[in-house]
Amino acid sequence: TFRATEALLNYIEAQYMLDHNLNAKSISYWKAIREAAGFTGEAADPQTTIAATDMAQELKGYTDGSGTQYDWGAFSAGKALTDPTLYSIRRERRTELMAEGLRWMDLIRWRSLDQLKKQPYQLEGFHLWNTPMEKWYTKDQLVDDGSVTATVSSRKLTEYFRPYQIVSTNMLYNGMTWSMAQYLQPMPLRQ
């Protein structure tokens, strides 16, 4: 399905990419999206968000057990964005369209996954080791030795559960990578 909010965000992004500034119509659309979500006053004004966006801070990322992770929307073609307005538009899309299955298409369109060519991504789940949750299971249930009988990833790697690092023979054990060919989608000869 297609939502009006998605259409408005598409317009805002396209208009900004074309003109490199937000026109009055884009600002009014953005305010309408925020007001529909319950924001009022300055919180509904996109200029407030843009003015508060520090790209140096956004690009610091956050550190987890595997190192530093970033918002993939802060990158295009393997390069970090420097434009707080464009990043704010992308962040608005991420927030407003959450769980609607559009994020993947956005990341492909922005070529945001280029950064995985240099730095593989480790998928991490819940915080398992050194938490009360660890005590919920017996030693037989939490085998983390990397053998074929292992049930969880090793505590030596990170405190978080890594589903692809349970056994060392997993083809994604060293993380998910990316190649340019993966941006292409196959087209059927007949439909």
Predicted features and spans:
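Acidic/polar-rich alpha-helix caps and helix-coil junctions
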Residues: 1-191
